């Protein structure tokens, strides 16, 4: 049993006791029955009114709860609709009081969410408005009267974040462009003269509208200023170039040049003005020194002609070059020609540089070719001979590659310009072919000269004898082996040798001219055959080394037809007798023969012990 039911029974018991107590009191007092009835009726009435009042109050409470439930349910549905959430559903059976409480709690929660969303929406709208005003962009389209959903709020947040990033990037770009604009204005000595320029340079950076239009206008302004700066720099550089040319033409002293060194850098307006004043001064000075200037221009013209590989006909086509009436019109013609040549060279600079590279490579190749044919290259070479050969081989490979590359580029140029590219009045490949042909002819001519020289030298040796220089070191005597030793009859020289040539005085082996040997039958001697174009092995060795061309002494050997045939070697006795005759002649004995005397003295001692050496007899 519920406690409320127990309390109700207790209330009934209390009421019964109270009525019984009233009856007892009435009996003791002696109240008649009719009055008891009235009094009981009053008690009943009071009790009933009290209970009715209590019941009415509880019924009122019930009605209020039911009404509250209805109101909360209605408001909750509205909030769920505004907040875009599912409607509230009560789980299971519940009392009116609990239902009202649950609905009221849910309504309060929904109201709180609605308030938070409205506050966040308001904050985002304020940020969006501020950013859009700075960026000059339209506001975010959202209904501020309705409650935004979570998705709508998330999108709004992302939009505001994007606006912040856009603002940061545009601000960075604005600051960078502004800095460059200020530098350009300072370089140009330019002061802001429009409202936009003043807003950019003078106003606060945070107050500047970072719209796309303003950024584009900023970029345009920067391009204009940079173009003005570039033009100003180009003008100043042109004025400086003009000043240097005028200095060189007028031969201005270095002291005077250093006086204006401060304006030879920079491109500000005051620098440009000072440069123009200097040019005007030099131009006036140029007019006063017309002849000197024109001659300087002519020197420069020749340099450009050389760089452009002009032929003699092309150079002669400029008739004013030889004129001697030094007037202003002549100077203008020369200036115009210089400008034309400069432009022509700059347009075709790559081709001219390629041809110049080929020319330099060709000259270097010819130099190595000359060194390769020089007999002196074998003396005092210091290890350079191999390097030169490698470089010459490298150049031989490089030249055809350069020629092919230039040929392709020149053909492309000729197709574009519909005219021939000339080098010294010829097409480039014709010029190259001519250079190779001239080189081949020069080599052929040199070869023929060497052959003719060798032929003449051989004929001279046949008539007068040869005297190759012996090495500084004496070769050791070969062992006298039975297989190689030849027994030679050695005789002393007869008096007939007095008819022969003068004996050698500077040392070395004596080679007499070959003569025909008399036949055993005593018939006439056979005439010696003349030397053909081929070199003998001795002659080849003689021409291959410079040392063989430089004689330590002079040899005049006897070569008349009646002399006996001479062999290649002399006996020690023959050499010794020759030296004894040489020593008797006071006109030939001098300090230069001291070394020879020592050598012959050693040879005489060696002859006494070594027996017969490889030698030849000189017969009368």
UniProtKB/Swiss-Prot annotation:
Overexpressed in bladder cancer cells. Residues 467-620 are annotated as: Unstructured, Arg/Lys rich. The modification Phosphoserine is found at residues 513, 571. Its main location: nucleus. Changing residue 470 to A: No effect. Abolishes CDK1-mediated phosphorylation, leading to prematurely recruit PLK1 to the spindle during prometaphase and blocking mitotic progression. InterPro entries: MAP65_Ase1_PRC1. Residues 96-133, 211-304, 383-463 form a coiled coil. One of its GO terms (molecular function) is protein kinase binding. GO terms for biological process: cell division; microtubule cytoskeleton organization; mitotic spindle elongation; mitotic spindle midzone assembly; positive regulation of cell population proliferation; regulation of cytokinesis. Residues 342-466 are annotated as: Spectrin-fold. Keywords: Cell cycle, Cell division, Chromosome, Coiled coil, Cytoplasm, Cytoskeleton, Microtubule, Nucleus, Oncogene, Phosphoprotein. Residues 1-341 are annotated as: Dimerization. The record marks 377, 387 as: Tubulin binding. Residues 446-459 have a biased composition (Basic and acidic residues). Residues 1-303 are annotated as: Required for the interaction with KIF4A. It holds the Pfam family MAP65_ASE1. It comes from the Eukaryota. The modification Phosphothreonine is found at residues 470, 481, 578, 616. Residues 606-620 have a biased composition (Polar residues). It is found in: Nucleus; Cytoplasm; Cytoplasm, Cytoskeleton, Spindle pole; Midbody. Belongs to the MAP65/ASE1 family. Homodimer. Interacts with the C-terminal Rho-GAP domain and the basic region of RACGAP1. The interaction with RACGAP1 inhibits its GAP activity towards CDC42 in vitro, which may be required for maintaining normal spindle morphology. Interacts (via N-terminus) with the C-terminus of CENPE (via C-terminus); the interaction occurs during late mitosis. Interacts (via N-terminus) with KIF4A (via C-terminus); the interaction is required for the progression of mitosis. Interacts (via N-terminus) with KIF23 (via C-terminus); the interaction occurs during late mitosis. Interacts with KIF14 and KIF20A. Key regulator of cytokinesis that cross-links antiparrallel microtubules at an average distance of 35 nM. Essential for controlling the spatiotemporal formation of the midzone and successful cytokinesis. Required for KIF14 localization to the central spindle and midbody. Required to recruit PLK1 to the spindle. Stimulates PLK1 phosphorylation of RACGAP1 to allow recruitment of ECT2 to the central spindle. Acts as an oncogene for promoting bladder cancer cells proliferation, apoptosis inhibition and carcinogenic progression. Microtubule binding occurs via a basic patch in the central spectrin-like domain and also requires the unstructured C-terminal domain. This is Protein regulator of cytokinesis 1. The gene is PRC1.
């Amino acid at each position: 049993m519920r406690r409320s039911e127990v309390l109700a029974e207790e209330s009934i018991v209390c009421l019964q006791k109270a009525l019984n107590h009233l009856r007892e009191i009435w009996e003791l007092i002696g109240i008649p029955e009719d009055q008891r009835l009235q009094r009981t009726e009053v008690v009943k009435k009071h009790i009933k009114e009290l209970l009715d009042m209590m019941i009415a109050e509880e019924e009122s409470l019930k009605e209020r709860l039911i009404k509250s439930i209805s109101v909360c349910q209605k408001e909750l549905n509205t909030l769920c609709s505004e907040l875009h959430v599912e409607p509230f559903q009560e789980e299971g059976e519940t009392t009116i009081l609990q239902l009202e409480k649950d609905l009221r709690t849910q309504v309060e929660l929904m109201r709180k969410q609605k308030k938070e969303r409205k506050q966040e929406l308001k904050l985002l709208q304020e940020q969006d408005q501020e950013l859009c005003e700075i960026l000059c962009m339209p506001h975010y389209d959202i209904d501020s009267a309705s409650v935004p959903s979570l998705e709508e709020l998330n999108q709004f947040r992302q939009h505001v974040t994007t606006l912040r990033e856009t603002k940061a990037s545009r601000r960075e770009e604005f600051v960078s462009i502004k800095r460059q604009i200020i530098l350009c204005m300072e370089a140009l000595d330019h002061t802001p003269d429009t409202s936009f320029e003043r807003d950019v340079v003078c106003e606060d950076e945070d107050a500047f509208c970072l719209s796309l239009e303003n950024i584009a206008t900023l970029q345009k302004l920067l391009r204009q200023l940079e173009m003005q700066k570039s033009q100003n720099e180009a003008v100043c550089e042109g004025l400086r170039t003009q000043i240097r040319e005028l200095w060189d033409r007028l031969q201005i002293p270095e002291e005077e040049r250093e006086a204006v060194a401060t304006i030879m850098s920079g491109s500000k307006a005051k620098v440009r003005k000072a440069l123009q004043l200097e040019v005007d001064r030099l131009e006036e000075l140029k007019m006063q020194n017309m002849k000197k200037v024109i001659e300087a221009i002519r020197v420069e013209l020749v340099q450009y002609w050389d760089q452009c590989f002009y032929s003699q006909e092309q150079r002669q086509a400029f008739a004013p070059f030889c004129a001697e009436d030094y007037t202003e019109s002549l100077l203008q013609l020369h200036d115009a020609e210089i400008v034309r040549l400069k432009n022509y060279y700059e347009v075709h600079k790559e081709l001219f540089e390629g041809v110049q590279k080929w020319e330099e490579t060709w000259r270097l190749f010819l130099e190595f070719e000359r060194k390769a044919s020089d007999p002196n290259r074998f003396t005092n070479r210091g290890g350079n001979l191999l390097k030169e050969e490698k470089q010459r081989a490298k150049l031989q490979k490089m030249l055809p590659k350069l020629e092919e590359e230039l040929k392709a580029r020149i053909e492309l140029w000729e197709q574009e310009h519909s005219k021939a590219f000339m080098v010294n009045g010829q097409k480039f490949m014709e010029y190259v072919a001519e250079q190779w042909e001239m080189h081949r002819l020069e080599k052929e001519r040199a070869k023929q000269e060497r052959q003719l020289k060798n032929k003449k030298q051989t004929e001279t040796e046949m008539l007068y004898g040869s005297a190759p220089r012996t090495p500084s070191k004496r070769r050791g005597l070969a062992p006298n082996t039975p297989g190689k030793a030849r027994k030679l009859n050695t005789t002393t020289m007869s008096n007939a040798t007095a008819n022969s040539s003068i004996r050698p005085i500077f040392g070395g082996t004596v080679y007499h001219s070959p003569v025909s040997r008399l036949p055993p039958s005593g018939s006439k001697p056979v005439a010696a055959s003349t030397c053909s174009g081929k070199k003998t092995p001795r002659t080849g060795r003689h021409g291959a080394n410079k040392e063989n061309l430089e004689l330590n002494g002079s040899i005049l050997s006897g070569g008349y037809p009646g002399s006996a045939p001479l062999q290649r070697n002399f006996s020690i006795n023959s050499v010794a007798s020759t030296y004894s005759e040489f020593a008797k002649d006071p006109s030939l004995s001098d300090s230069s023969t001291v070394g020879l005397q020592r050598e012959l003295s050693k040879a005489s001692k060696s002859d006494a012990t070594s027996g017969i050496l490889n030698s030849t007899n000189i017969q009368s």
